[in-house]
């Protein structure tokens, strides 16, 4: 029984789904691995490093697909790749079902089982497979680094003979995995950090990292049973906007991370709020692909509004692909270990297993 993986479009996606470390782990389950030639050369990982642990290489992606029962991907297959997929094979990756619904339906017509790992249930048994957490954590970190690069001022307070440099002030909107890492990173770099979230329960997490929590008074519970944020009422949005009017005038950098699963990102910073920031300030919108939290944010653009930089560069994983690939590949290995039956020597699609049933595209 073979697991395969092919090269992504490197200009758009630098991550890989299998590293030499996870290849060794997958093979230890009793599986074979097929990879496309020069699979991770762009990351400085040579084919020999894979071959040393028992991986077989093919010259073309179609050969890999034809010789593999399960295909690991990072992103949704291209139209050309879909044509080469075998019937009754298995596809695992991050496929953004709401965005790629038609493409995924086309694949399922070929009797292919698709598992999209961003649909994993939030249960303890699935934590080692949680691709959203592993990748969002890195995105939150990198968003702070990129914002500071664009800020053009020092971040920590510095006391010098020439005078005192004040600490930069950073506001994080959304205190999920990406937001909490953004808080921690900005704090370590010496910034004064505050954060806000629709979930009142996140107050303790923000404060544990040294951030100040900006609380919007609310009566409704805006947290799902799975711990995600829910859509807020118009009354709540008005209160949130009033709170942010004061915050936007004081902060130098804003990191936007607020998302609602299966829905467009909530628009939290309108044109008026963006323009309240000082000239030279920076807004990084991590939610830009889902519609964006901030006005003026556009995918893969840096827009300058009244001297304020609004950054919408997507897929920050391309800025640290080695680390992102390492974590993602480990997530995939954990999923395969759960899916593969050593006794049957085959993949076991057990719909009574919540991990399998929730991630399977039907």
PLM segments and residue spans:
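An N-terminal-biased, well-structured beta-alpha scaffold segment characteristic
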Residues: 2-106, 110
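Rossmann-fold NAD(P)-binding glycine/threonine-rich loop
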Residues: 98-124, 264-315
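Generic hydrophobic/aromatic pocket-lining and core-packing "Φ" positions
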Residues: 23, 47, 82, 104, ...
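Short, ordered loop/turn segments at secondary-structure junctions
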Residues: 8-10, 38-40, 76, 96-97, ...
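A structured beta-alpha segment of the ubiquitous adenosine-cofactor-binding alpha/beta core
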Residues: 55-69, 76-77, 223-254, 258-275, ...
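Glycine-rich phosphate/diphosphate-binding loop of Rossmann-like nucleotide-binding domains
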Residues: 6-45, 154-249
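Adenosine-phosphate binding glycine-rich loop
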Residues: 118-119, 124-161, 167, 288, ...
């Amino acid at each position: 029984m073979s697991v395969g993986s092919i090269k992504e479009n490197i200009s758009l996606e630098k991550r890989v789904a299998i590293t030499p470390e996870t290849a060794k782990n997958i093979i230890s389950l009793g599986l074979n691995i097929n990879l496309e030639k020069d699979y991770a050369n762009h990351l400085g990982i040579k084919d020999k490093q894979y071959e040393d642990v028992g991986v077989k290489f093919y010259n073309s992606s179609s050969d890999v697909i034809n010789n593999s029962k399960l295909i690991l991907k990072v992103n949704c297959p291209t139209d050309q790749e879909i044509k080469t997929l075998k019937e009754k094979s298995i596809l695992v990756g991050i496929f953004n079902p709401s965005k790629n619904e038609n493409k995924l339906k086309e694949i399922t017509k070929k009797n292919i089982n698709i598992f999209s790992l961003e649909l994993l249930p939030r249960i303890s048994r699935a934590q080692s497979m949680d691709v959203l957490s592993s990748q969002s954590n890195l995105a939150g970190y990198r968003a702070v680094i990129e914002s500071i690069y664009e800020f053009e001022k020092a971040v920590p307070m510095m006391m010098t003979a020439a005078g005192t440099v004040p600490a930069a002030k950073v506001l994080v909107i959304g205190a999920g995995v990406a937001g909490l890492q953004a808080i921690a990173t900005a704090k370590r770099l010496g910034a004064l950090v505050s954060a806000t979230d629709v979930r009142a329960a996140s107050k303790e997490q923000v404060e544990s990292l040294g951030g100040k929590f900006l609380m919007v008074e609310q009566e409704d519970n805006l947290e799902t049973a799975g711990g995600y944020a829910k859509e807020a009422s118009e009354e709540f949005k008005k209160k949130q906007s009033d709170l942010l009017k004061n915050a936007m005038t004081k902060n130098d950098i804003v990191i936007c991370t607020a998302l609602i699963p299966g829905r467009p990102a909530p628009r939290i910073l309108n044109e008026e709020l963006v323009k309240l920031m000082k000239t030279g300030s920076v807004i990084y919108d991590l939610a830009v692909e889902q519609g964006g939290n901030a006005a003026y944010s556009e995918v893969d653009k840096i827009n300058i509004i009244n001297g304020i930089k609004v950054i919408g560069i997507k897929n920050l994983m391309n800025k640290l692909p080695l680390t992102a690939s390492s974590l993602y590949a480990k997530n995939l290995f954990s999923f395969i270990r759960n899916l593969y039956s050593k006794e049957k020597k085959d993949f076991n699609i057990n719909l009574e297993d919540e991990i399998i049933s929730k991630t399977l595209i039907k």
